[in-house]
Structure formats: structure tokens, C-alpha cells
Amino acid sequence: MYKRQVTPPATGISEEENLAGDGDIHKVYLTFEDGPSDHTGEILDILAQYDVKATFFVVGKEDEESQALYQRIADEGHTLGMHSYSNKYSQIYQSDEAFEEDFERLRDELYQVTGVNSIYYRFPGGSSNQISNVPMSDFIHYLNEQGVIYYDWNVSAGDAASNAYSSEEIVANVMDDVVKYKTSVVLLHDASDKSATVEALAPLIEALNEMGAEILPIDEDTSVIQYVKADSID
């Protein structure tokens, strides 16, 4: 059975506090959401080639291949986070009960498959989305009670908005913004229609290495990037 871990709400860093100055080390967190898919294994292969760890905010899948990918993510030292079970906004955000049921279904599945007590979550659409029928503060309060830290992003590859970006454009989108911040949480996708993201990954890692960035998985030492700060919710 999943073991609940209760921690105080995370304090999100402000954008002003996060602006990089001369001599600051850039910490970059590559985060992939919407998988696992047929691209996830390719992404894991590339990360292994460069000895880079990342974070995967996964959705719920019950097929054998997807569950093997959950296990591989954990076994290879990446952070296994949650992105909802269904990834269907109209269902997840319909009510408090619907959100909690979706969350618990994914959390419990990941624990049963991998033994990982995942404590990281990314809201579909982010914590400031305008899609939910229920105030997002309700869901944030629930995650706070569960001891779960949610992460938004402050750098986007652009692959969510369009599949038209080339791999070169995806790299440029990321590199244009990571130079601004001490901590960059990069939004990427490993859904089945994101082949350009896979093609962009190796040159992106090389560009980040060239600028001297540290590429890290989200963990307890990571500065929290949130649009709606968890500690602002009663």
C-alpha cells in the first residue's frame, strides 16, 4: 500500500529571486510529460548516452510496455512524477472528487508497479490553468495535505503548442530562456506525436553542457517553480 508522506507546503521561488547574475551556475531540469509512449524509450536511451537524469511526469497506462517504462524510469535514476491518470481535463477538473480519484489511481498504480512513492506532480495545463470547473486552490490544498509538491515550468520548448517546430527550433526555444535563470524547469513532451522533441534532445544536452549548465532531476533540493504558490493556499 502507498505510504502517505506529509510535508509542509513547498515555498516557490519568485522569478526575481531566480534571475541569473554573472557567475551563477545554471541548474536545468528537463521534464517530460504525457508519456510513456513509443518515444519514451528513445529518450531514455539518449539520456543514458549522455549520463543525464531527467524528470518524467507520467500519465496512467496499464499495458505491459508502459509499465515497463515506469520501471525503467525509476531504475535508471530519473524522477518519476505524476501528471494525472487520464490526462483529460474535462474529467480531472470536473470536481474535487474527480481530481482526487484520478490522482489516487495514478499514485497507487505507480507504487504497485515500481515501489516508488511519488511525491511530485504536474497539473495538466499548469497550476494557473483557466480550464478547471473548480478553483485550482482546492486541488492545491489537497496536494498540500498529501505532502505532494507540484511543479510548473519557467522554460518551454514550445512542443506543447505545436508539432510544427523543428528540432533546431525546439533547442533554440529552450536555450533562449535558460540563460535567464538560476533554476530552469523545462517543459518537454514525450507523447507519441513528439518526434521533433526526441530529435532535439541530444543537441539540447550538448548545448547545455557547452554553456556549463548542471542538468539534474527534480529532487528535494530543487527550487520549486510554481505559478500559484503552494504556501499561499490555506
Predicted regions and their residues:
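Catalytic domains of cell-wall/extracellular-matrix polysaccharide-remodeling enzymes
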Residues: 87-187, 191-209, 213-214, 220-221, ...
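Conserved small/polar residues in nucleotide/adenosyl-binding loops
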Residues: 1-5
